[in-house]
Amino acid sequence: MKLTCVLIIAVLFLTAITADDSRDKQVYRAVGLIDKMRRIRASEGCRKKGDRCGTHLCCPGLRCGSGRAGGACRPPYN
């Protein structure tokens, strides 16, 4: 009986430790994915005046404006 209780407690303890470790790894995996997406977007370059900008960044000095056909990079309003 004592041996069974010790084994149950040991299994529960080890399960709790491994569950905690896997939760932390999942967070780091998500952070790594976000960093990878940023690197991919940065490598694509910026969008020039008149280019569509829904999911991409406009070049410096331009902003993504809305229109009937979707967003396009254009100079900011004064």
Swiss-Prot record:
Show the stretches that span the lipid bilayer.
none
The coiled-coil segments of this chain are none
Tell whether Signal is among the UniProt keywords.
yes
Q: Which UniProt keywords apply?
A: Disulfide bond, Ion channel impairing toxin, Knottin, Neurotoxin, Secreted, Signal, Toxin
Cellular localization per UniProt? Secreted
Entry text on domains = The presence of a 'disulfide through disulfide knot' structurally defines this protein as a knottin.
What name goes with this protein?
Answer: Conotoxin Bu2
Q: Which organism is it from?
A: Conus bullatus
